[in-house]
């Protein structure tokens, strides 16, 4: 039903529980018989609680849910869009398409789910200790279980054979930790959907060749995408057929470890492996840094370190991104006809609206964070205190003797 606030109309969908079959059949009609689309939507994007109760029967309900919430935020600002206007942009995925996390999380009070799609994490300071490595692992899992994709860089891990101050004496290098993070990703699943992970390393790292080869063994590092960060100096050395120096730490003026390699041979290996197994991806890192807005504020601590799992968005540690797509097909007028053309005017208008909606989604994300913090403040957990007794049998034994 509809209601009006300040001349803006809003649609409210009454909460009703649907069976899986009801939701599937209605979604099948919505997608005009596309069984895969209907099944994926019901399994992944329909609002449901932890008991499996389904509260939406088709993407139309989902689009009203998103439109209502975005319209609520819009009402805080001038020239607010109504829920009906927003629904017209979302319906049937015609123009503006919020991606997975916003589709699932906006207006969803049954699940703790972030509205951000992807995160990059990292550790400041001494980052190659086991404590730091486990901290990244824990943060990765906590984000993934709340529907976030994660990326992080491994260039801080000391190379294989480096001395360590424990019983092992030397480091195993970064490849075993690729397996650790990969396995953690595979362990986190939601309705058959596992986490998404990007692992990156600088070509300057002495273990970068082992990193590049890690996925050539079948069954290894299957829970992660891997990309190597290529520098201009490496690419120039590969073109010129000159040697390239790798070192650890990678940016140190006085590195602890250095080795010289053939840049051309390593470049050929990257190309071969990418041809054979579709990995590693390549990140032209100096170009990324030159174009990076955060790195303009490097003196304030901002630094781009890795990308989201799909590799299209470089991010700083503990930064996040929200994804939204625009369906270009819908802007083609008279498709597949001689007089077909692209409606640039409508496209320009919708690009501006899409960015505005993304700003609204940030407001919605902040609300979720505020609710989480309010719960923590109002419901603090009691701290456990443990008092142990040693020699517990001694008093009894001594009394018996006496």
Task: Identify the residue ranges that each predicted region occupies.
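Extended catalytic cores of very large enzyme megasubunits
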Residues: 1-389, 393, 397, 402
